[in-house]
Every structure is written in structure tokens, then in C-alpha cells.
């Protein structure tokens, strides 16, 4: 909308005595230009009309519902809140452990990084592309004992904490290998007697899963997912045999 910036823009229309708020998502309503997106007259008319009635990209939200959602003005938080999955469970019921990665400063990382190949590596957000972790992760000289709890276990689910779309991967860690995750990542150890990590990844990367993550996202400039919201996310959990079949097809 504005030249020279990619920061999302929100507009608030204020009035008195309301018991509800109509939220409108116009993020996909524009004409793409070479250097800058623009609103056509038709786009503007569509947005104005959306402020008057519920539709595909607008919804009237009660003050009570706003309060329950921490007064978030992100429409995706209120879409399909009544979605029901067959065999749906809370995410925390299949999690053995969840932690954020290590919050290391740039100077700390400079001291830790090794020019030589070692059995210790560092995983950053940029090392995850298209759901796959880069095999050529930076090597580390050593991992301080205090940081050991931030190391990734084999088959851990890795989820980016910030940014959209969120990045998701399953880590493969060899017996003698140590991988330290950074603070922008959630490291999720699943109970594999209940859930196949690749099945959970497949769900979170599906249209339904992406929508579910959007509903628990807060912030517009830098979208992020809070750990409590993540733990209470509802995921469909069929029998393990069916999960394994889906995971095999997905990783194909």
C-alpha cells in the first residue's frame, strides 16, 4: 500500500456505544503492481462493503469474544473457531517436551562457531527451507553444558516461533551428533507411541493446519505463536497405523 515498506497496515474506524466490532481482512484485495500494490476503485468498494456486513473476509465479533482472544484484531483468530476434528486432541496431550531454542547473542555465536567439521551444529530459522533442514548446518567448537537442554533430539518437530508462513520440519539427529537450536524455534519432542512426527508435520502444513496456526497467531508486523496457545491447539489424531500411512505418503 505504501512505497518503501513491507510493513502491514491496519485501519481502525472508531464510534461510540458499540457492543461488537466488525473485522475486515483486505490483505488479498489489491492489484499487484511492478513495484507497489494498489487499490482499484472496485477494491475500495469491496472493502467498504465488507465493513457493513459479514462475508468471506469480514465478521462481526462481540466484545466478549474479543476479550477471550486478548483483544486481537486479527480476523483469522475468529474464523472457524467451531472447527471440529474427528478424534481431535489437544497438542499438549501428545507432547513429551517443548522448549524454545537457545537465546545466543551474535558475539556468543562468533565464539562458538567452528571452521572445522565437528559433531556439533547450530540450527537457525534460515536453515529450514520447504520443510527440510539443510544438511550443511554451521559447526560449533563446543556446546556449553547450560545450553545442552536446547539441543534437538531425533524426530523432534521444529516450528518457527515468529514470522508467517511458519516453518515446520522434522529433525534427523544421528547418535553422536548434537544440534543446538536457536531461540526463534520451538523444539517439540512428541510421544511417538501416540503421534507420528511426520503426520503432525503433514497436518500443520495442510490447509487446515495453516488455518489453525493462524488462529493462534498474535501480532501483525511480526506474527508470533505463544507456547500456551500452541499447547492447546486441537489436532486430529487418528490411529497410529493410519498416521503412519499418511506420513509415508507425505514423505513419499
Where in this protein do the model-derived segments appear?
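Non-catalytic DNA-recognition/assembly elements of restriction-modification systems
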Residues: 50-109, 232-252
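A short glycine-rich beta-alpha junction/loop motif
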Residues: 12, 76, 115, 178-186, ...
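AMP-binding (ANL) adenylation modules
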Residues: 1-4, 112-114
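Short glycine/serine/proline-enriched coil/turn segments at secondary-structure junctions
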Residues: 2-5, 131-132, 149, 177-179
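A short beta-sheet element
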Residues: 124, 143-205
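Sequence-specific dsDNA recognition surfaces
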Residues: 37, 92-111, 126-154
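PDZ/PDZ-like peptide-tail recognition elements
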Residues: 108-109, 115, 121-124, 200
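Flexible, glycine-/basic-rich loop-and-beta segments that form/coincide
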Residues: 2-75, 79-85
Amino acid at each position: 500500500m505504501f512505497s518503501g515498506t513491507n510493513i502491514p497496515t491496519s485501519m481502525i474506524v472508531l464510534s461510540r456505544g458499540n457492543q461488537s466490532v466488525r473485522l475486515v481482512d483486505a490483505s488479498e484485495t489489491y492489484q499487484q503492481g511492478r513495484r507497489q500494490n494498489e487499490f482499484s476503485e472496485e477494491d475500495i468498494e469491496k472493502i467498504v462493503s465488507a465493513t457493513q456486513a459479514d462475508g468471506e473476509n469480514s465478521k462481526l465479533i462481540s466484545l466478549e469474544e474479543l476479550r477471550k482472544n486478548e483483544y486481537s484484531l486479527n480476523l483469522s483468530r475468529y474464523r472457524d473457531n467451531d472447527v471440529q476434528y474427528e478424534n481431535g486432541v489437544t497438542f499438549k496431550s501428545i507432547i513429551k517436551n517443548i522448549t524454545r531454542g537457545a537465546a545466543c547473542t551474535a558475539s556468543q555465536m562468533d565464539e562458538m562457531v567452528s571452521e572445522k567439521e565437528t559433531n556439533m551444529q547450530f540450527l537457525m530459522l534460515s536453515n529450514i527451507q520447504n520443510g527440510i533442514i539443510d544438511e550443511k548446518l554451521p559447526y560449533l567448537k563446543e556446546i556449553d553444558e547450560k545450553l545442552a537442554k536446547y539441543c534437538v533430539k531425533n524426530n523432534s518437530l521444529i516450528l518457527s516461533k515468529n514470522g508467517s508462513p511458519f516453518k515446520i520440519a522434522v529433525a534427523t539427529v544421528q547418535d553422536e551428533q548434537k544440534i543446538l537450536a536457536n531461540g526463534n524455534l520451538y523444539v517439540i519432542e512428541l510421544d511417538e507411541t501416540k503421534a507420528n512426527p511426520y503426520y503432525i508435520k503433514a497436518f500443520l502444513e495442510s490447509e487446515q493446519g495453516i488455518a489453525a496456526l493462524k488462529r493462534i497467531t498474535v501480532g501483525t508486523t511480526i506474527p508470533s505463536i505463544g507456547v500456551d496457545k500452541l499447547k492447546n491447539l486441537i489436532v486430529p489424531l487418528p490411529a497410529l497405523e493410519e498416521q503412519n500411512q499418511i506420513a509415508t505418503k507425505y514423505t513419499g
